C-alpha cells in the first residue's frame, strides 16, 4: 500500500513539474547572453573561436548586460584579435 502511494505521488509530481515547465516562456533578452563582455572575447575563445579578421562581432561597453552593445569587426591589434567598433 505504501509503495503504490509513493509511486503515485512521484508520478503526480513529475507530471506537475512538466506542466509548470511547459508554461514558462523564454525572455526576449536571451540573445544578450550571447554577447561578449569585452572586445577581446568578442573575437576569441571560448565562445568565438572561429572568428578571424573581418568577422562581425559585438560586446557590452560596460560590466553589465544592460550596458550599451557595441558592434564592430574583428581586427588584429597589438598582436591579438579584438573587436573594433565600426
From Swiss-Prot:
Biotechnology section: NFAP2 provides a feasible base for the development of a fundamental new, safely applicable mono- or polytherapeutic topical agent for the treatment of superficial candidiasis. Moreover, thanks to the slow emergence of NFAP2-resistant Candida strains, NFAP2 can reliably be used long-term in the clinic. The combination of NFAP2 and rationally designed antifungal peptide derivatives (PDs) as biofungicide can also be used for the fungal infection control in plants and crops as well as in postharvest fruit protection.
Region Lipid-binding, annotated ranges: 44-54
Covalent S-S links between cysteines: 43-57, 45-74, 49-83
Secretion signal span: 1-21
Segments carrying motif Gamma-core: 72-83
This protein's record includes keyword Disulfide bond: yes
Location(s), subcellular: Secreted
Membrane spanning residue stretches: none
Keywords: Antimicrobial, Disulfide bond, Secreted, Signal
Keyword flag Disulfide bond: yes
Domain of life, per lineage: Eukaryota
Function: Cysteine-rich antifungal protein highly effective against yeasts such as clinically relevant Candida species, including the multidrug-resistant pathogen Candida auris. Does not cause metabolic inactivity and apoptosis induction, but the fungal cell-killing activity is connected to its pore-forming ability in the cell membrane. NFAP2 has a low potential to trigger resistance in C.albicans in vitro, and the developed tolerance to NFAP2 is not associated with severe phenotypic changes compared with development of resistance to generic fluconazole.
Entry's free-text remark on domains: The lipid-binding region (residues 44 to 54) shows potency to insert into the lipid bilayer, where the disulfide bond-stabilized short motif CPNNC could play a key role. In addition, several areas, including the beginning of the N-terminal (residues 1-8), play roles in facilitating initial membrane contacts.
Name the UniProt record assigns to this protein: Antifungal protein 2
Organism of derivation: Neosartorya fischeri (strain ATCC 1020 / DSM 3700 / CBS 544.65 / FGSC A1164 / JCM 1740 / NRRL 181 / WB 181)
Name of the gene: nfap2
